[in-house]
Amino acid sequence: MMTHWPSPAKLNLFLYITGQRADGYHTLQTLFQFLDYGDTLHIEPRHDGEIHLLTPVTGVENEDNLIVRAARLLMKVASESGRLPAGSGADISIEKRLPMGGGLGGGSSNAATVLVALNHLWQCGLSIDELATLGLTLGADVPVFVRGHAAFAEGVGEILTPVNPPEKWYLVAHPGVSIPTPVIFKDPQLPRNTPKRSIDTLLKCEFSNDCEVIARKRFREVDAALSWLLEYAPSRLTGTGACVFAEFDTESCARQVLEQAPEWLNAFVAKGVNLSPLHRELL
């Protein structure tokens, strides 16, 4: 029985803010691609109905952690529909590699991995569509991780169209700051009226991120990281930051630049993949 479950990072290869709804949420167009790099969840089934997170995250109460919330949500919904075997529970621990507030989707990916893994281990039989619907109640980015395929996203990020962008190599760098998403989305100078375009048009354009100008203005570390990366390759912010990335055609080119990274920059090289490592394990 599989007990080690990948929880991959994602990149937003582009991100455009197309408007703001009456409820305050922003509408966007973005392109998600996974990385063959991320956290690892270790999940051991229990038979007493208990959910235990064995590796607490600093600053986050266990019951508020997306890992625990996802497990309890699946338990509740599967139980209410008569699909939860008696006594289903789990011990969960995490090898954390992805930074908090980094724009790599770590928390959302963790939640999705828990939903997919426990549905499999408990043999609940929920469909991917059902799991994605549950995931959306936990966060806008959770469904793309549940579905496990690179996707063009619209709406508030919940309308997903599978796509297959080129699988390039990336140097991903964390500049040492954490950016809470609301800091970017509440900034009055954030561009909020980028015209909507078709996916075909967007894939032919030079990629960019509307959040980048705000992140660079408010966080000098992000500005410094991007300034350094841009000397070597096309580079931009992922999500609302703080991570930035540069794209390369080969692993060797990416690693050559990594070797020159300044000491204050925490960086790694990973390949972009259109099929999530989580789903690759399940095939």
Curated annotation (Swiss-Prot):
Keywords: ATP-binding, Isoprene biosynthesis, Kinase, Nucleotide-binding, Transferase. Pathway: Isoprenoid biosynthesis; isopentenyl diphosphate biosynthesis via DXP pathway; isopentenyl diphosphate from 1-deoxy-D-xylulose 5-phosphate: step 3/6. One of its GO terms (biological process) is terpenoid biosynthetic process. One of its GO terms (molecular function) is 4-(cytidine 5'-diphospho)-2-C-methyl-D-erythritol kinase activity. InterPro entries: GHMP_kinase_C_dom, GHMP_kinase_C_sf, GHMP_kinase_N_dom, IspE, Ribosomal_Su5_D2-typ_SF, Ribsml_uS5_D2-typ_fold_subgr. It comes from the Bacteria. It catalyses: 4-CDP-2-C-methyl-D-erythritol + ATP = 4-CDP-2-C-methyl-D-erythritol 2-phosphate + ADP + H(+). Its EC number is 2.7.1.148. ATP binds at residues 99-109. The active site is at residues 10, 141. It is an enzyme of class 2 (transferase). Homodimer. Belongs to the GHMP kinase family. IspE subfamily. Catalyzes the phosphorylation of the position 2 hydroxy group of 4-diphosphocytidyl-2C-methyl-D-erythritol. This is 4-diphosphocytidyl-2-C-methyl-D-erythritol kinase. The gene is ispE.
